[in-house]
Amino acid sequence: MVREDLRNIAIIAHVDHGKTTLVNEMLKQGGTFRDNQVVQDRVMDSGDLERERGITILAKNTSTTYNGVKINIVDTPGHADFGGEVERVLKMVDGVLLLVDAAEGPMPQTRFVLEKALAQDLTVIIVINKVDRPDARLDEVVDEVLELMLDLGASDEQLDAPVVFCSARQGAASFSPHQFGNDLKPLFDTILEHIAPPEGDENAPLGMLVSSVDYSSFVGRIGVGKITAGTIKQNMQVTVCDYHNPDLKTSGKITALYQYDGLKKSPVDSATVGDIVAFSGIESITIGNTICDPAAIIPIPFVKISEPTIEMTFSVNDSPFAGKEGKFVTSRQIRDRLYRELLKDVSLHVKDCLLYTSPSPRD
């Protein structure tokens, strides 16, 4: 079964090269929003810290439609500290848009995310963004990207990647570096032509890899992943297994099933091969688990989650300004908030510890 009505892509880039702005424009031109609807900038960055810093921290799922084809889009973080998010979500897609600033060219994180995409043999579409910058180096940057792909061992097919020139802020794209487009039609056409549609057997036993998790105070832990085989249905009994931990086998029931529809998660009764879905009902679910048919337990291989890159210690605030700023200022409240974050961020480690402070000479 080939899903010609579906494409799954991720947008990868160095921080501040315009990923989230491009997703905004793709959603607008794909008809996700009404003509009279006011759309805020960086609509995908929903977290307070993401909006404050102007960066993407957690990978986000959304979708739009072009010429009757649904395009599932994953907006990934561009900062090196959140590289683990990029590694995981690449398992859900069949191709990537590699976004590169027309003036800055490939940057350190560009190399990191591109290496991960090439290692998984994903189709790459090169998007040169911010072509309207006065210091843009269009031809040079294209050469730099191709040289980087060559250094990373890209195959001949990957080196033949199409190039689209784009201004995400103006919502315009073109195949020529010297001709400015009016909309993103060249980019959409390139996605449909070069990104392969998902394939699989919808009648086979269910197989789905959990690549991301979320948490809701209403339904509990939510797993997100792409169906690689079979069909998943609401109220279906499933078995959870893990490739790196073969002894782990638990049973569960899919109590709610959702697909991404623009910025919303819309409830559905069933989904099949190639669909990216979110589900609830299994509280122990975590990234790397396989959801499968109890009659055919086959774990799907998955990359191990990267270890944290930063370590922080929280201790009692003995500043003269202690307790005068912020809403939640006690150590118990901070601890509770960190443990709540563990429910949806499995790359985070939290440990309780006892800090001993030696007495001062006055004591």
Show where each model-derived region lies.
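Conserved Switch II/interswitch segment of TRAFAC-class P-loop GTPases
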Residues: 80, 93-111, 125, 131-139
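Flexible hinge/switch segments at interdomain interfaces of large molecular machines
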Residues: 165, 300-316, 349-352
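Conserved small/polar residues in nucleotide/adenosyl-binding loops
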Residues: 356-363
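Conserved beta-strand/loop subsegment of P-loop NTPase cores
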Residues: 96-99, 121-129, 157-166
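Active-site phosphate-binding and catalytic loops of NTP-dependent enzymes
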Residues: 32-38, 44-58, 149-159, 192-206, ...
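Conserved nucleotide-binding/hydrolysis modules and their immediate coupling elements
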Residues: 209-310, 322-324
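Canonical P-loop GTPase G-domain recognition
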Residues: 135-191
